[in-house]
């Protein structure tokens, strides 16, 4: 804390030291990231957001990393066996993951990335929530598969994600809705 003071005066705030100014000074200037609102959307389930945050930081223990540390015999993706298990592969290129994301996008009638960037407010929240749920369930299934050596069909996982997204939309939805959102929500109700 010594560098916050010069000649007995508090540098960060001309009014002097306060708990708030001290806390802000200790935090420092953190660069903002473009994906913050995508991961930490208040409609998302917190444990899903946490996994999303780990994914964005590439901090999950993937087989590629474990293989380099000689903790596993291969680095092959356990879900599709088509490439090394990296963050990019598991959540973007893996055929198993792509199936889940595609089925969710078909149900929601919107590409998740497009909905997050360009959708109505309701669609942005719902797409962020669906994205985090997909990533969470993919990671959960990957871990179950490593332990139990059996893989659940993507349709079963999609059913769970759809139920969760549908329930949470109904919890957070605020009336009145835009006409486009009314039609969209009715479509989700019909297909859930």
Please give the residue ranges for each predicted region.
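A helix-boundary/hinge signal
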Residues: 1-192
């Amino acid at each position: 804390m010594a560098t916050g003071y010069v000649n007995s005066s508090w540098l960060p705030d001309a009014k002097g030291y306060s708990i708030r100014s001290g806390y802000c000074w200790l935090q420092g200037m953190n660069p903002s990231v473009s994906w913050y609102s995508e991961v930490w959307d208040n409609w998302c389930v917190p444990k899903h957001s946490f996994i999303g945050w780990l994914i964005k930081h590439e901090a999950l223990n993937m087989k590629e990393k474990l293989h380099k540390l000689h903790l596993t015999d291969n680095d092959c993706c356990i879900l599709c066996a088509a490439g090394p298990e990296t963050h990019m592969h598991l959540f973007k290129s893996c055929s198993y993951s792509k199936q889940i994301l595609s089925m969710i996008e078909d149900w929601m009638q919107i590409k998740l990335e497009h909905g997050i960037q360009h959708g109505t407010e309701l669609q942005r929240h719902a797409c962020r929530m669906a994205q985090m749920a997909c990533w969470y369930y993919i990671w959960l299934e990957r871990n179950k598969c490593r332990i139990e050596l059996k893989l659940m069909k993507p349709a079963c996982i999609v059913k769970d994600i759809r139920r969760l997204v549908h329930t949470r939309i109904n919890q957070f939805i605020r009336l009145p809705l835009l006409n486009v959102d009314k039609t969209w929500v009715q479509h989700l109700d019909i297909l859930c």
